[in-house]
Amino acid sequence: INYDIDEYDERLLRHLALGYTKEMITNLKGMPFGVKSIEKRQNDLINRLFTINERSGVNACRLVTRALELRIIDIDNLEPDEE
């Protein structure tokens, strides 16, 4: 199954898993998005990774859990980018 995850999606999911806030993620080196764009990207990921019936009330924690379950991010290799 291809969820069409790009580099920025992976970085967003990885840093959410590490406990970064959206504001902290926007300040990462090479992350060309503001908070609104990060929120839009997060909502887009929710739409791609959850069925219509599962999407209600999905927060960042649940999104990260799904990404781990689908092996989009690897719990054993969660390293932050250089800031």
Language model: regions and residue ranges:
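Regulatory and interdomain segments flanking nucleotide-handling catalytic cores
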Residues: 1-2, 41, 79-82
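Short helix-to-turn junction characteristic of helix-turn-helix DNA-binding domains
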Residues: 13-20, 67
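Short, mixed-charge, low-aromatic patches
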Residues: 1, 18-23
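Regulatory hinge/linker segments at domain boundaries
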Residues: 1-14
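Basic, Lys/Arg-enriched C-terminal extension of HTH/homeodomain DNA-binding domains
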Residues: 47-83
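Recognition helix of helix-turn-helix DNA-binding domains
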Residues: 21-62
